[in-house]
């Protein structure tokens, strides 16, 4: 089932008929992505799993797409996807490619012409997450809650078991730099590496 997200009525219906996986699509403004970083935190763990099959941040009224704010909002949203990997099984940015002289919609991850390609800020967010995936989601909290926009900060953490690396993704959507202190608890010493 493809949707723009499941409301309560649809969630109950999908669970009742035994749907295993729903395909949710989000083409929304940056504010929506920031506001929905905690979207799956309270999701029914026994309900259908989620394929975030198409998502991209854009601001069509202003014509701004593939800018830094859009990429930042996607990075914030992706902390929630990663934190809830038990529910969100798959995710993909869309659309991926567009020719600068013949495109159907905007935004796109990579633009190209007959001689070259241009990677967008959104591309680099996807690359950062793709190159820093983990095997186990770690519980990361600020003041006892997931980091989903408090003080304009968003975060997720994973462990890459084969390498022993703890990988932290931290998004600062605020207008000023923030001093952040990370404390680890519950990890065995061999699981912590510097780098």
Regions found by a protein language model. Give the residues of each.
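Aromatic/acidic polysaccharide-binding cleft in carbohydrate-active enzymes
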Residues: 47-155, 162-164
């Amino acid at each position: 089932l493809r949707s723009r997200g499941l409301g309560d009525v649809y969630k109950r219906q999908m669970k009742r008929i035994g749907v295993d996986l729903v395909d949710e699509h989000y083409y929304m403004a940056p504010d929506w992505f920031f506001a929905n970083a905690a979207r799956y935190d309270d999701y029914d763990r026994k309900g259908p799993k989620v394929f975030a099959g198409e998502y991209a941040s854009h601001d069509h009224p202003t014509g701004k797409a593939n800018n830094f704010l859009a990429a930042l909002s996607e990075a914030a949203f992706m902390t929630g996807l990663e934190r809830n990997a038990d529910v969100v099984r798959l995710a993909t940015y869309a659309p991926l490619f567009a020719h600068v002289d013949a495109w159907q919609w905007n935004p796109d991850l990579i633009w190209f012409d007959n001689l070259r390609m241009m990677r967008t800020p959104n591309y680099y967010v996807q690359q950062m997450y793709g190159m820093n995936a983990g095997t186990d989601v770690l519980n990361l909290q600020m003041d006892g809650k997931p980091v989903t926009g408090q003080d304009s900060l968003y975060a997720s953490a994973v462990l890459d078991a084969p390498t022993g690396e703890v990988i932290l993704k931290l998004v600062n959507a605020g207008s000023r730099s923030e001093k952040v202190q990370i404390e680890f608890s519950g990890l065995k010493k061999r699981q912590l590496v510097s780098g």
